[in-house]
């Protein structure tokens, strides 16, 4: 039965949940509800109340469910990704920000807070490989008075970053992180990066990632995926002042490699790994000598 036929919202969501579960979607009930809420223009709380009433299924619901069943990312269908306190615009050509990156942002924010208490004058932060602009937008809106700069190379991702950083005060540069922002060399307080880091022969497990995230945002270059992380670390070393802070996200299995990368360069001290909310090694940081 088509979910667009005259059935109740509750029955439509129940049917959509079954369709998505059969397709292997990891959170079928939540996604079914979010798709309905998106079409109805309501939040999940209001939708929950509507499910107990006599509301009809919204027109076009089955089409969106079919797209999600084909493993198109939920965020691409709704056009929205939630990150920390932000509602970001996302779609084809841009990496969908992940919840685990929120903890990386928090590390940078904590350092900026301490620096602001210890120093007079404005602070500066750089996001290398900003993608959707999630990290830069978080820094710009949560760290008062910090001058934020963001760099993105992808022609496809750059417009999404422009949209998400509009009105935040952040400065966005369209260019390669390896040679960007030379005018800031030796002056920046904090650098954050979530660079591409997947090894060349690794195949992402999730179909949403494998089929829809841009390869440019996934694969780090080289057999071990370390080319772009190495470049990010080198640029951070160039940009940061002595005593500046660098934090970079990576895969759980790359923690030792990232620590060795920073420790072996001679540019960093107090190198350490950080776990995310699931207890997995998610980031490595260091302080500029």
Where are these regions (language model features)?
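Short, flexible, mixed-charge acidic loops at enzyme active sites
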Residues: 80-81, 201-215
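Glycine-rich S-adenosyl-L-methionine
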Residues: 155-158, 208-241, 245, 251-253
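Non-catalytic accessory regions of SAM-dependent methyltransferases
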Residues: 1-48
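Conserved SAM/SAH cofactor-binding pocket of Class I
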Residues: 100-206, 231
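Conserved beta-strand segments of alpha/beta enzyme cores
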Residues: 87, 147, 169-171, 269-272
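Conserved AdoMet
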Residues: 29, 36-111
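Short, electropositive alpha-helical surface patch
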Residues: 247-265
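Core SAM-dependent methyltransferase catalytic element
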Residues: 260-289
């Amino acid at each position: 039965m088509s979910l667009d036929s005259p059935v109740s919202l509750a029955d439509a969501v129940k049917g959509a949940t079954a369709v998505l579960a059969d397709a292997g979607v990891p959170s079928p009930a939540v996604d079914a509800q979010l798709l309905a809420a998106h079409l109805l223009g309501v939040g999940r709380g209001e939708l929950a109340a509507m499910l107990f009433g006599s509301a009809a299924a919204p027109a076009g619901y089955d089409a969106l469910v079919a797209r999600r069943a084909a493993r198109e990312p939920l965020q691409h269908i709704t056009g929205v990704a939630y990150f920390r306190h932000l509602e970001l615009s996302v779609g084809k050509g841009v990496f969908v920000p992940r919840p685990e990156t929120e903890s990386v942002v928090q590390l940078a924010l904590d350092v900026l807070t301490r620096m602001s208490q210890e120093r007079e004058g404005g602070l500066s932060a750089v996001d290398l490989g900003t993608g959707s602009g999630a990290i830069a937008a978080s820094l710009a809106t949560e760290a008062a008075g910090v001058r934020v700069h963001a760099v993105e190379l992808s022609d496809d991702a750059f417009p999404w970053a422009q949209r998400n950083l509009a009105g935040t005060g952040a400065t966005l540069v369209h260019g390669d992180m390896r040679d960007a922002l030379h005018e800031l060399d030796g002056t920046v307080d904090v650098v954050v990066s979530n660079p591409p880091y997947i090894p060349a022969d690794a195949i992402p497990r999730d179909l949403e990632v494998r089929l829809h995230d841009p390869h440019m945002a996934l694969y780090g270059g080289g057999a071990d995926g370390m080319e772009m992380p190495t470049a990010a670390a080198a640029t951070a070393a160039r940009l940061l002042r002595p005593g500046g802070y660098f934090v970079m996200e990576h895969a759980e299995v790359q923690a030792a490699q990232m620590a060795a990368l920073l420790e072996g360069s001679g540019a960093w001290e107090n190198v350490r790994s950080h776990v995310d909310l699931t207890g997995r090694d998610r980031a490595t940081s260091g302080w500029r000598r």
